A protein has these predicted regions:
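Carbohydrate-binding surfaces of carbohydrate-active enzymes
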Residues: 2-90, 104, 126-127, 131-132, ...
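Short, surface-exposed beta-strand/loop micro-motifs that present aromatic residues
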Residues: 26-31, 116-117, 169
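Disordered, acidic Ser/Thr/Pro-rich linker "stalks" and the adjacent N-terminal cap
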Residues: 60-125, 131-139, 158, 162-164, ...
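Short, conserved beta-strand segments of beta-strand-rich sandwich/propeller modules, principally
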Residues: 127, 177-179
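Short, surface-exposed beta-strand/strand-loop-strand elements in extracellular ectodomains
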Residues: 138-151
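Short, surface-exposed tryptophan/glycine-enriched loops
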Residues: 166-177
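Short beta-strand-plus-loop segments that form exposed binding edges in beta-rich domains
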Residues: 181-188
């Protein structure tokens, strides 16, 4: 996605009060990077050859918020198990090991499966990041994310493709368990990373 922080691609002094806001840029981030796309942000240089202070202040705040949003991966505090595993080399634990070269995989004939995260204690969550092992292709066609609230599973998000990265945002849920289900895939699913966060945007 190609977006400029200002109305145009070049600096104009009369546009100093038209710089995109922090909320606008965060929205672009989550609708591009968060949906399996890239984000090319144009930042025009002013007549001094520098980024204008207004632009810089917005960018620094966006960076601060994003760093905080992804700072703590709550999934790493949970016990993770999967409904199907190809073998110990493709265990569900690879989803939270921080290694981009490892991944969870199901048996060849299995195209629908789920992974469950047990936090042991009630945990506040409002963001969920998932990545496919994209070196072997994009496979997932439909998925569901559920939280165990009270005494039942409640759907908090659904979607279709994942690809390199999908970030789901939803109202904060206080839950002890999360379940991510791949409802449909072109071939056996391969997931390399899952992160759960509690962000301040809710």
């Amino acid at each position: 996605m190609n977006v400029s922080i200002r109305p145009g691609w070049f600096y104009h002094e009369e546009q100093d009060d038209q710089v995109k806001t922090v909320d606008q840029l965060l929205d672009v981030y989550y609708h591009s990077v968060g949906r399996n796309a890239t984000w090319n942000l144009n930042i025009p240089i002013d007549e001094r050859g520098l980024v204008h202070p207004t632009d810089s202040a917005v960018l620094m705040e966006v960076a601060k918020i994003l760093q905080n949003n992804f700072k703590e991966n709550l999934a790493q505090q949970a016990e993770v198990r999967a409904s199907n595993v190809r073998g110990k080399d493709f265990a569900a634990a690879h989803l939270i090991d921080g290694n981009k070269d490892s991944y969870w995989a199901t048996d060849d004939e299995v195209t629908s499966a789920s992974v469950e995260f047990d936090f042991k204690v009630p945990t506040a969550i409002n963001q969920f990041l998932v990545q496919e092992y994209i070196r072997l292709g994009q496979r997932v066609k439909a998925f569901t994310l559920e939280a165990f609230v009270g005494d039942e599973w409640q759907v908090v998000a659904t979607g279709s493709t994942i690809g390199y990265k999908r970030i789901l945002r939803f109202p904060t849920v206080e839950t002890q368990k999360l379940r991510f289900t791949i409802n449909e895939a072109k071939a056996c699913p391969l997931l390399s990373n899952i992160e759960c966060n509690c962000c301040s945007y809710d």
